[in-house]
């Protein structure tokens, strides 16, 4: 028989996305109203479990956060307890510290709201005996255990809205407009937004692209009566035989920072068109992570469902 649950912890890890606060709200409302559990908020992801940065979460803490972007608990891409990098750049395994802090806080359960990296850490902690429930969040939609992650739909809507605006200016000025979107090594945002926004070319990480074919497609748009073109490229896309473009390498516990492929594609198109066509590049960037979650998102229900997924210490 599972032990009686009295206190749970909740943290948000990795990159932020729309809907994090809605999940936190769902967890707190369900746990406190239905089961009278005490909820402990862990600040700045797993770093909070390592450094003991926690605070109680009550009904007053979640007022007005349903549609609020970001996360009231803070988050970080650093702080992997299994590969923690200290200020001197020394890597340490602090997973035992996390397990001890979970026990010290008397947590009967831990809700980890995160993407592939955070949930991989959560799975490792579960194997060490921690009572963990993972909530799949990421704008990248790259988690295999669920069809759609929360945050993805809102990011797609943001990218599609940008395409709507770019299309009118591209047509007015007879330009090629290249839009670089996020997604890391997955092309879901580029694909869905590109289709919805009527892009002429969509480049995704899963399919290396041929520079010549991209240029041919753009050239045909200008040979006809259209006179403009829209290209959507995911940040992790790369040409045949090429490498993913990065802005910064992986170091000090951080993942490599992707970005720059949009400008590469724009330069390629400009060169193959002989410089006769005006090519402009827009990098959508972190605007895809912010703002109010879309109406289609199901963060509140996900937050409330956490309570039925507990596993006891094993």
Where do the protein language model's features map onto the residues?
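A cross-family phosphate/adenosyl-ligand binding-site feature
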Residues: 1-13, 23-108, 113, 117, ...
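Short, ordered loop/turn segments at secondary-structure junctions
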Residues: 13-16, 42-47, 77-78, 115-118, ...
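Small/polar-residue-rich loop-to-helix segments that shape phosphate-bearing ligand pockets
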Residues: 49-110, 116-197
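Accessory alpha-helical/coil subdomains and C-terminal extensions
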Residues: 101, 112-114, 120-124, 131, ...
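Short beta-alpha connecting loops at secondary-structure transitions
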Residues: 141-143, 147, 249-253, 292-294
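Mobile late-domain/C-terminal helix-loop "cap" segments
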Residues: 284, 289-301
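Positively charged, low-complexity/disordered segments
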Residues: 299, 303-314
């Amino acid at each position: 028989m599972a032990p009686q649950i009295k206190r749970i912890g909740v943290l948000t890890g990795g990159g932020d996305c729309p809907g994090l606060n809605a999940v936190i709200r769902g967890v707190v409302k369900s746990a406190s109203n239905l089961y009278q559990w005490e909820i402990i908020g862990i600040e700045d992801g797993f770093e909070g479990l390592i450094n003991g940065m926690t605070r109680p979460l009550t009904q007053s803490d979640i007022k007005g956060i349903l549609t609020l972007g970001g996360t009231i608990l803070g988050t970080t891409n650093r702080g992997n307890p299994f590969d923690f990098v200290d200020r001197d750049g020394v890597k340490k395994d602090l997973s035992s510290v996390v397990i001890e802090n979970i026990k010290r806080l008397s947590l009967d359960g831990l809700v980890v709201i995160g993407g592939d990296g955070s949930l991989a850490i959560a799975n490792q902690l579960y194997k060490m005996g921690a009572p963990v429930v993972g909530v799949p969040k990421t704008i990248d939609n790259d988690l295999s255990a669920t069809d759609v992650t929360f945050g993805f739909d809102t990011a797609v809507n943001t990218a599609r809205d940008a395409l709507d605006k770019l299309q009118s200016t591209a047509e007015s000025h007879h330009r090629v407009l290249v839009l670089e979107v996020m997604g890391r090594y997955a092309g879901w945002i580029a694909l869905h937004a590109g289709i919805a926004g009527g892009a002429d070319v969509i480049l995704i990480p899963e399919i290396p692209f041929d520079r010549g074919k991209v240029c041919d497609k753009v050239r045909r748009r200008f040979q006809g009566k259209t006179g403009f073109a829209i290209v959507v490229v995911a940040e992790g896309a790369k040409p045949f035989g090429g490498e993913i473009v990065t802005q910064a390498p992986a170091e000090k516990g951080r993942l490599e920072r992707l970005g720059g492929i949009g400008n590469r594609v724009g330069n390629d198109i400009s060169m193959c068109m002989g410089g006769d066509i005006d090519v402009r590049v827009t990098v959508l960037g972190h605007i895809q992570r912010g703002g109010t979650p879309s109406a289609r998102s199901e963060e509140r229900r996900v937050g409330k469902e956490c309570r039925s997924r507990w596993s006891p210490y094993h």
